[in-house]
Each structure stands twice: as C-alpha cells, then as structure tokens.
C-alpha cells in the first residue's frame, strides 16, 4: 500500500484519508457487515460475456483464499445464479436478506433469488431498479467479504449510474469485444 499523497482526486471513495465531501451519497452497508473491495463489471453492449467474467473473477479470488461475493445489479436480465447452478430462493426477515451461497461459499444476491419462478420477467422502471440495487448493497447481510464484484447491465443507463454514485467502488472491470460499435459504447461507459 502506498503512502497518502493527499491528492484525493486519485483515490477511491473508501480511502480513510479522503478530504472533502463527495458529490454522491454512498449507501452504508447493513449493520455488522464488512466488504473490503468492490469492483463493478461493466460492458457497453450485451452478450460480451460480462456475467461469465464476473463469475470467473469471484471463483478465482475464492480459490486464492479470499471471501468473495457477487451483487447481480443486472436486475432485468439476471444470470449470475444460473452461472452457479443456483435455483433456490434467498431468505430474510423484515430487517435483512441473507445472501445465497454457492457450494464453494461465494455469496450471491440477485433478483432471480427473490422471484417465485426464475423465468418471471422483471418489468420495472429505472428508479425502482436503482432502489433494488441499493437494497442489495445495504439490506443484505454480506458476511465479511474481501472482494465483491457487481455484475451490471450493459450500457450507461440508470443502474450503472446508481452503482457509480451509491456504492464505494474501488475500480471497474470493462468487458468488451473487438467490434467497432462495442468500442464506441465502451468509450461512453469509461467516460462515466
């Protein structure tokens, strides 16, 4: 870890030495929860393998001895539970939701884990979807996570904006393919 240079424009939102107020409102985790590092996984276009990359990153870090989690922010097109063969439902109380765990202990939260049938469509507008993503961050009992990967929907719409403004991201991972159209859209996502 490097020494603080007090150039706060170059540090992450979770930096303990950060000076000045953030223009965004970072939502706190549920009481007693701790997540050390948060990485958003984004793409400019659907179908480039973003959810598979997200899953592989979590598995790789888990195999290296870290506790990992995936927050599936692709609310209208969730696929993370399917990547792990999870078909059960998340349980909770009035106070919190428990993440579902894979066979190897990766913690997952996805809208598909809350639906009665995983094939039920989610037909919600932007503000509702953004609220769900914030609830997945703040109302789920994440259990001592070293690395959380946030699988986002493609593009630069409401969900990526909500994640960038309300979760303490330490970085983003951009998944792309070589097509010219995809490169243009990825450039827009990077500029966010």
Question: Where are the model-predicted features located?
Answer:
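Cysteine-cluster motifs in flexible loop/terminal segments that predominantly coordinate metals
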Residues: 1-28
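Residue-level signature of catalytic and energy-coupling elements of molecular machines
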Residues: 35, 46, 72, 80, ...
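Phosphate-binding loop that captures ATP/GTP phosphates
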Residues: 67-68, 73-118, 130
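Amphipathic alpha-helical transducer elements in NTP-driven molecular machines
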Residues: 32, 77, 126-134, 157, ...
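Walker A/P-loop phosphate-binding motif and the immediately C-terminal alpha-helix
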Residues: 37-75, 190
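Phosphate-binding P-loop
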Residues: 30-36
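Switch II (G3) loop of P-loop NTPases
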Residues: 92, 111-127, 132-162
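Conserved catalytic-core segment of NTP-binding enzymes
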Residues: 146-192
């Amino acid at each position: 870890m490097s020494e603080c240079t007090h150039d706060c424009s170059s540090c992450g939102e979770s930096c303990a030495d950060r000076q000045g107020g953030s223009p965004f409102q970072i939502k706190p985790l549920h009481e007693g929860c701790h997540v050390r590092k948060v990485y958003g996984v984004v793409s400019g276009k659907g179908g480039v393998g973003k959810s598979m990359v997200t899953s592989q990153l979590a598995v790789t870090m888990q195999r290296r001895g870290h506790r990992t989690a995936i927050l599936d922010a692709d609310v209208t097109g969730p696929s993370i539970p399917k990547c792990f063969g999870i078909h059960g439902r998340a349980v909770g109380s009035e106070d919190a939701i428990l993440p579902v765990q894979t066979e190897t202990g990766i913690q997952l939260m996805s809208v598909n884990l809350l639906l009665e049938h995983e094939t039920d469509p989610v037909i919600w507008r932007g503000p509702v979807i953004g609220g769900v993503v914030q609830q997945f961050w703040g109302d789920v009992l994440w259990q001592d996570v070293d690395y959380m990967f946030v699988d986002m929907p493609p593009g630069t719409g409401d969900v990526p904006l909500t994640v960038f403004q309300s979760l303490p991201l330490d970085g983003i991972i951009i998944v792309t393919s070589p097509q010219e159209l995809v490169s243009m859209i990825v450039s827009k996502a990077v500029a966010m």
